[in-house]
Amino acid sequence: MQMRSKKDILEIKKRILQNFAEERSELKFKDTYQLLVCVMLSAQCTDKRVNLITPRFFAEFPSVKELAKANLASVKLLISSCNFYNNKAVNLIKMAQAVVRDFDGVVPLDEAGLKSLAGVGQKTAHVVLLEGAGANVMAVDTHVFRVAHRLGLSRAKTPELTERDLSEAFKTDLGKLHQGMVLFGRYTCKAIKPNCKECFLNELCSSKDKNFP
């Protein structure tokens, strides 16, 4: 459920796009396979940490076919500095095996195909689609969720319903808005001590957190 007027929504959208016009994901990847692995690893883990892990990972498993044949212990060792590495290692191998078996070794770029893979939920699928295919989809992580609620763009209690509210509010440029909101939440509208004084959305903010020290 949206809480802002159409005028406010359009202004918020315009400012986010203006301030993050050329921004891309901070994850480092070269192709769709690497993108999917990075996004799967990034759950409950910082992009910086993922970027430290992946060079050795991709040197060991340069394609989905190599990962599909990987030894579980080897994958765990390579990603052990990442949160929930045990589950992620299992899902990475299962994901790769499914891509080889069901998609001829090519990571699918449709939502149903992606969500059929182990460890891939709606958020992960949407990030892969917007980054890998330029799809007009929204993805809600912890930063986007926080920003959406502080700006009064949603009252929803789940990421999925928040995604629906944002998609209905913004309609277009959803991928760019997702990336802008991620970076805005990461560096300006932080969970603790948000930088309200230098915020380009300050006067449009409806959050109680606006006066945080």
Residue ranges and their predicted role:
Residues 2-213:
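Catalytic cores of DNA base-excision repair glycosylases
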